Structure formats: structure tokens, C-alpha cells
């Protein structure tokens, strides 16, 4: 019998010679080892073991671990249930090469305590337990208000003795009937649930709650755990082992390739839009490949809030993973118990009231979908709102926000929940309601849309002031409030930049994590880097003077060694107590220079000052070329320092622009040396299947540099893959301001690297796809690019134009049945040679800006034109 190896054992063993022997006990790995022994003769045992593991699919690596008891098929969806808990343990796709389970279970999330479970399929409630007969509240001037009861938790995870599970006729049914023996078990209501296959590749979950008490029942919390397979930390921590005080887990670079493989192929990201009946959650692999799993309420079911319970017994033994998401249909008790009274969630909080014997039904649907665009269609088909917004959910004053609401019925009423919202235009076209909105005054702007017999969906925008003025105001604030001017500072932070504490209205000088106030690291460089880049576009003499003083008196004197160009970890340090945490760095630790990330920031600060000097002539202390040379030397140190030197770093893509300016200055030797370092870095990114790691468990700091480097060095396939991975970071397209267009990092939205990754997505030039619906289908113009497509024979059904890829795809047809040949002319193309493909063949043609193509109509359903 084959010896099984757990995921953590797999990770633990990779990277050690002893680990090679353990890995070879797995039959598939042993067989592969035999086949590759000759090729690996020049490798160390460690390298050979790692290569053998990476050569397998992640599906093979984990194949021995899945053990489910009940299975249901719905189209391409395979659903597996665990009869012990009455929960869904797995949703996979038929034929998936990775066999990814979208949901979390005891296998992919080891360490959870099933005795208080919150698996997908569990129900978490909090009811108001009356202390006696409910009496009308007396609220007069002299009346004494008496609380009628207290909140009491009732959960399926504590109701095993009343759980009844059955599987008949392809229906999985779970019932909780009778009072549970445990205190937090279900006692106040009867719960009936069932699962059946829906249309296409979908699963439908029906829930019915019935009040079995003799009194009015208030359910102040009714939440459905969605346990996604998103325990990334489990790949870094040993179950029951000590927590890594740095918060980064065990970042062992010998194990990183396997960890990244498992993260991208076996884990999922969860994107939430929680705003009423049109709510949804999108689960997808970080790899970004379709299909995705969409979870959304149907019928009269609305999610109003989402949260986690990291302190629950279910996750008490976990390290780094905070538990499943709870999708709350009602959350009034949650607000009260968590003391959110002064800070309620954006949709408000409600309770469910049931009279004795009264029932309430809910429904949730799980569906495999082929694309991001399909989210809107599925929500629309459920009778809710498919929402599109342009240009964004964060809108500056004076900019219109355009909203398209695809719905089966018109909007009944729009309630404005914030001040200074103007609905400039509202019209119904076909099955779409089009809104033009305008906002005034900074802050959240919320609208409640009522439609479809009592359904509702909230839209939450955020209004900001003029962006240019905000950038200028931020620059002034950095100079006025964060530029440190104490020449007697014992840590040499004079003329450095320190963070600002809004709680006390001052910069702060001390922190338990010393790097926060030490001038280096992201905490130390954020102000100076912003200020330098801001002055490239909006120069201010005072700010440039401050930047030069910063470089001369602090950065290039104490933070960075002016002789060696090494960058220290922190100027600030502490004497340690026996009780000190990891962040209390000693003087010796603060002087460490191995962190690759600390080099890219000063390199870019110097490069910004070079550009400021070249463009505006505002420099007083150094010439522009001196700053460029400092940037060059820092880059060379960057590409040769630390374990992260050849992975992507935030702003790392700017090395391409530094290289271009060095070439422009005619520094051939420096150009060639830096180019060679960049080539080596890019090659490692190309060779690594998933070059998106970090010093942390999960991060988004690598992607931007990987994208621009692979583009610069012509690695088309890795560049395409990186775009796909980048899209997955913000794949939900949730129309709410704090999630729309923001990278998802673990549980965090609005992650600081979203703007840099946004540069990559904007640069990738997503193609413009258009389906012609003007009734003629003869002509289309891409206005911004001045490209015209016109057909004289046949009709254009669909066209996809990509400026960045210099390609055009057409789908043509002929409604008359008389045209045997499709004939079209394209104007506005870049001059040069083009590859024209259709009908399984291709040819090269030259264009002076115009191109005429004729193709048999039978082959015109797929015509592709690509710049050669």
C-alpha cells in the first residue's frame, strides 16, 4: 500500500536531502525519479527532489487525500457531501486538470475543530431568548425600560444529535428536528435543508426555518458560512506548531516553488459583493483560469453583511487563517454583540421575526461560470440586477458615474441614502436601466434600488475631491507634517520622513515594530517616494528642496551607505526585554542590508529627482546626472542583494525606465551591465512557473515587475499568464467602492499594491469587443484608435480589437444566403506586414494603413488579423 504524504509534509520535506527520500516513497514521484535520474546526475539531491515534485501536477501531488462519502453530479459540477456534518465538502469540475476543490474541508484546511463546525452547509444563528412573556415596551418619560431577554447562539455545528441526513433521488437532505442537547445547539426552530442539481452546472441549496416555540421568535443573526479553500497559511505553518512572530510564516525559498504551485492551482480567492438580493461571491483559482464558482442568493434571499469568527472554536487551533466567511441574511445580533453600534456595516442590520409556527424559506445557488462577464448574466437570470459601472465606484466631483442595471423589470424606486447625490438621467432601454449619477462632497454615496416585488440592492460609491488637488495637498502635508527636523535625534532621522499618527495629530517616533519609524522599508520610504514621483508631474520648488535635503542629510548618509550603496533595515532600534516581540530589532539587526525590497525605493527616488532636474531645472544640490548615477548603482546593488533579488518587487518595473535614461545619456558600459542583471532576473521569472512570491505568505508585490519585465524581454506566454493572474486578484468586479478594482490580499481589500498592478492591467490593453446591433452590421469605428472596419459583402456579427497586441478578430455572416464571399476593408492600421488567418490557413499581406480582405463566407466566421 502506498505511503501517503500530507501537504504539509510535502512542503516540509522539499528542500532537504532527507526530504528527497520521503518524496520518493510516493509511487508517482519514485517512478518519475527513476526516469529522470540520468538527466539529474549533475544536480544536488536537493535540486533533483525539487525538480521531480515540480514536474508533477498539483492534482497528482494531492490525489491520495480526498475521501468523500456522497457524490452528486450537476452538469460539469461534481459535488461531494460529508454525511457526518451534513455539509458540502467539495465542489470540483469534471475534467479539471488540477482537480481543485473550491471549498474548504478538513483535508485542505487541517486544524479546524468540527465539533463546532462552520463548513459550507452549516447555519449560524443567534436568537433572542425571552426571559418571560413578551410585554409591550413602556417608553414614557418616567418609565423604566427592562430588557426582555438576552442573545443566545444556536448553530448546526452544535446540533449533531438532532441532525438527520439522507440522500435519495439525487437530493441531499439535512434536517434538524427537536431541541439539541448542547447549550448552543438549535432549540428554537426546525431547520430543513436540501440540495439538488440546477440548470447547467449548478447546485441549488434550499433552506427553511420554522419557529417551534410558543412565542414570537427573533433571529438576530442568520448567517451561512462559505468555507472557501483559501487557507494559504496552512502551506507555511505546522499544525499546532509555534506561530511565526514576524507574521510571514516559514518563508523557506527552497520550498517556495512548490508552495506557489499549490497556491495557484489548489487554492482559491474569494471576491464578495454583499449588498442585498444581487449579492454574490466569486471563487476562483489565483491562476485566474475559468471556470469560476459563483455563489449567489436567489428567490427572496438577500445578504446584508459578511464577517468572520476568528475566535470561534472552529478556528482556534489555526495559524494565519481566520476562518470562513459568514454570509449574513440577518445581522442585528452581530452588530450588538460585536458592539458595532457606532460603526454599523454599510447595508445596515436587521432581524427576522417569526410568529409561532411561521416558516421562512431561502435559497442559494452555486454555479460554474465560464467568464467574469457571466457574473452579471447569472445574477440577472435569478431576477436580480446585473450591474456595470463606468468609470469607477470612486468618483471625483464633477465626473459622471454611468450605471447600467440589467434586470427583468424596471427599477421601482431609488432611495438616496447619502447627501448630495444627483440622478441626472434615468432611462429604460430594453432590459436595462441606465443611470447617470453625479456627487458632491467627499464621502460615501449610497443608493438603495428597489425592484421586483420587494427586492433591494445597494450601490455604495465614494466621492473624492479633484485628484490633482489631492496629490498636491498630499505633497504639502508630507513636507509640513512628516519631514523630521530634530538635528539631535540619536538615530540619525534628522531630515528623514516619519509616519503621522492621526489619533494624536503628530508624527510618531516610537513603534513596537521599529521599521515603521526607521526611515527604511515600505513604512519609511512611502512618503519620500510619493513626494519624488509627485514632483515629476506637479513640481513645487519647496518640495524639491526638501527632497534634496532628505537625500543629503539622511537617505544617502545614514540609511544608504554612500560608499557601498548598501541600504540598512532601519535607523531606529530597541534594547530588547525578555518579553520583547520580533519587531524589537536590536542595533545589529537594524543595520542588516539583505532585504532586496529596500533597494528599489531609493533607486526610484533618485531616478525621480533625475527627471525633475531634466524637466524643470529645480535641483540645487546635485546635477540630474548625479542622481541617475546613484540610481544606477542602487539598481546594481538591488539585483545582487538578498534572497528576493530575482522576484518581482513593488515599483521594480521602473528599472526599465532607468535603463532607458542611462542609454539616453550614452552610458554604454552602465547600460550593458544593468541590462545583463535585468535579463538574469527576467529569465528566472520566465523559468519559474509562478514567480509571484514574496517575503510573506501571500502577497501582490511581485506581479507588476513580472508583467513589465516579461513584456520588455519578449516572454509573451509568461506575460499573458501574469495578466491572467493579475485579473484574478480583482476578479469579482464587485460594484462597491472598497472592492471595485482593488486587489484582494487574503482578507484585505484596498491593498497598497493595487495601483501598481493596475498599471500592468492598463498597459496590457484588454481588447475592445463589440457585438453589432445597429440592424445593418456593415460598419464599426473604434473612435479613440481611429480604426474603421467596413464590409461590402456579408455582415459583421462581432469584432475584437486589441491595440496593444495589434490584432483584429472578426466574426462574419450573411443573412441573405447569397454572398459567397466576405469582403471587408480596414482603415487606420499601423503600416507594415500582417498575418491574415481564416479557414485553417494564413497568409502575409502588406498594408500602408489600409487592408482589404476577401474570404469564403464559410471561413469568415473566424477571421484573425495580426501584425507580423
Short names for language-model regions:
Residues 371-373, 846-868:
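C-terminal beta-strand-rich structural cap/linker in extracellular carbohydrate-active enzymes
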Residues 478-748, 752, 756:
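Catalytic cores of extracellular degradative/oxidative enzymes
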Residues 9-30:
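N-terminal export signals
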Residues 49-66, 71-73, 84, 265-393:
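Beta-strand-rich recognition/accessory modules
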Residues 64, 125-206, 212-214, 330-350, ...:
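Extended, loop-rich substrate-binding clefts of extracytoplasmic carbohydrate-active enzymes
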Residues 782-830, 854-861:
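Carbohydrate-binding surface patches
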Residues 50-54, 61, 68-70, 105-118, ...:
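Polysaccharide-binding surfaces and accessory modules of carbohydrate-active proteins
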Residues 231-237, 378-398, 456-499:
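Low-complexity, Pro/Ser/Thr- and charge-rich linker/hinge segments at domain boundaries
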